[in-house]
């Protein structure tokens, strides 16, 4: 995994589904106020569920010969697809483009397909995206959008070489998203509060600026261990719409097409093909290690005064201009993308209990 925030979630969502774990022992201590989220079932404007494409041994960036074509894979990013998109796609294009001449095909129009297509265009090549689904009907649209890798590998299943690949992808994505901050792409910086199982800095502290352990006087939460840092958050529907517009504006094409077998790719005119099919790579290319991990979200009406994110045993809350996201499930091997009302109710209830337990409010 990566950070404690969703370590609570990845542990099985038991804490979330049983309600907020607060003790009440800190209520008489000094307190720094924040505005609480107004968590009321009547404020839920939509519920969604998406499938994270999870591989225990980590995401795949690999070039394979494919008849008279070259096939470059770029998939399997678990819950870190938005976060790692630019870096992983850069690795993929660095594998595919050198020595290539002519147009390029990208399979898939989620965040990996769109960022791969943009990098292909930036390198001077014409590109066509072939996809079975367009935004907003892609898994990427459901993503919460915190720039922080989560749920995309198992510590005991990855190699040192893969860890180096991950670090390089994270570094490039981190720098690229900073250049995109602002309204156009829906990227903004926010302070993030986490209930933490540890109080020492992580190995990835460089991607968590201003990280520090807080005393009870520094926050309003009825929690024992809290850390705070800053990171970027992506309003994914806006981000994906703008990337799509960028691809089309630079002369790219997007065609609706479904591929049932790898042999179907042989009919494409392009000699270089990037596979950015996410969870679809399991069936299309027979990757049995790829498994779905379902995440469910309840989205509340926007609340402009909420200018922070928070996460812990109750779940996680990300504020966006299109709504307040409440999440916290990590359901392995569940293929159904229909939100479960009972689970959504528990997500809402756990967040209502958490924000209702603030020791002081702004």
Feature roles, as predicted:
Residues 271-277:
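Short hydrophobic core segments
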């Amino acid at each position: 995994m990566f950070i404690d925030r969703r370590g609570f979630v990845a542990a099985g969502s038991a804490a979330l589904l049983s309600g907020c774990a607060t003790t009440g022992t800190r209520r008489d201590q000094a307190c720094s106020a924040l505005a609480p989220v107004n968590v009321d079932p009547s404020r839920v404007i939509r519920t969604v569920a998406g499938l994270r494409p999870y591989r225990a041994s980590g995401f795949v960036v690999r070039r394979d010969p494919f008849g008279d074509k070259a096939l470059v894979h770029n998939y399997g990013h678990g819950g870190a697809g938005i976060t790692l998109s630019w870096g992983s796609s850069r690795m993929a294009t660095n594998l595919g483009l050198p020595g290539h001449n002519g147009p390029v095909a990208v399979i898939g129009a989620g965040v990996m397909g769109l960022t791969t297509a943009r990098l292909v265009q930036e390198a001077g090549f014409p590109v066509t995206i072939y996809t079975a689904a367009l935004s907003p009907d892609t898994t990427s649209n459901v993503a919460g959008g915190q720039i922080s890798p989560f749920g995309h590998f198992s510590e005991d299943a990855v190699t040192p070489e893969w860890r180096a690949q991950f670090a390089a992808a994270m570094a490039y994505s981190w720098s690229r998203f900073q250049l995109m901050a602002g309204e156009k792409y829906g990227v903004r910086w926010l302070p993030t509060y986490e209930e933490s199982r540890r109080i020492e800095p992580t190995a990835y502290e460089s991607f968590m600026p201003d990280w520090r352990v807080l005393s009870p006087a520094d926050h309003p939460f009825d929690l024992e261990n809290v850390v705070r840092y800053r990171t970027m958050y992506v309003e994914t529907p806006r981000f994906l719409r703008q990337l799509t517009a960028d691809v089309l504006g630079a002369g790219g094409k997007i065609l609706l097409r479904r591929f049932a077998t790898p042999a179907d790719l042989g009919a494409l005119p392009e000699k270089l093909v990037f596979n950015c099919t996410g969870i679809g790579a399991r069936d299309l290319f027979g990757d049995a290690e790829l498994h779905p991990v379902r995440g469910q979200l309840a989205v509340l009406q926007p609340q402009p005064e909420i200018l922070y994110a928070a996460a812990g045993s109750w779940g996680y809350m990300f504020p966006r201009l299109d709504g307040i996201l409440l999440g916290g499930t990590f359901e392995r091997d569940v293929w159904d993308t229909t939100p479960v009302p009972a689970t959504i109710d528990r997500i809402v209830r756990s967040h209502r209990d958490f924000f209702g337990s603030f020791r002081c409010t702004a």
